[in-house]
Design a protein with these regions (language model features):
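Adenine nucleotide-associated cytosolic modules
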Residues: 1-177
Length: 177
């Protein structure tokens, strides 16, 4: 995946410096990989990676443009750890495995990654350039079956321990799964 992505991105724009990490993202390397970046675009396809990314981004204070897909639906939001909502605010604990089949098990409409990825790219550009109203605190859900978009307000969970204010106490660890 890494080499293919780099080749494609370089072909689209040879002036872009594409940095790849051909490693499994884990508690042992995520802080080093994310350090120095201004925005993270999350396309993780599993809950352990999403929680790992959340905790590291909160500790580092890096906003995350989150995108997820399932069957005929996609979701996009921006998690802003420096005062905004985070992934753990939206979903404090991973759902039981029987309620969260993988994309391979459940199936995904082939065009959804492109739709969700385009919205994520737009949100990342807005964040970097400081333009428009971003999706921090709001989740946009796309339903391909009826071609509708819905918006949901997200709220901070005041009982959470994994917060920007507690960043020095955050232990980066991997969830089983």
């Amino acid at each position: 995946k890494v080499d293919s992505a780099k080749k494609t991105l370089t072909a689209l724009n040879p002036d872009v410096d594409v940095v790849t990490y051909d490693v499994r993202l884990g508690a042992d390397n995520i802080m080093d990989i994310l350090a120095g970046y201004d925005v993270v675009i999350d396309g993780a396809d599993n809950f352990p990676s999403r929680y790992l990314l959340n905790d590291a981004s909160v500790k580092l204070g890096i906003p995350v443009v989150h995108g997820s897909i399932f069957r005929f639906e996609g979701q996009v939001t921006v998690f802003d750890p420096r005062g905004g909502v985070t992934y753990r605010d939206m979903l404090p604990e991973p759902p039981p495995a029987e309620f969260a089949p993988s994309c391979a098990e459940a199936g995904v409409l082939g065009v959804l990654p492109g739709i969700v990825g385009s919205i994520q790219a737009l949100e990342a550009i807005k964040l970097i350039l400081g333009l428009g109203e971003g999706l921090s605190g709001r989740l946009v859900a796309f339903d391909a079956m009826d071609m509708s978009f819905r918006e949901y307000r997200l709220q901070k969970d005041p009982s959470l321990e994994v917060t920007w204010e507690n960043r020095d106490r955050i232990e980066i660890a991997e969830l089983d799964g």
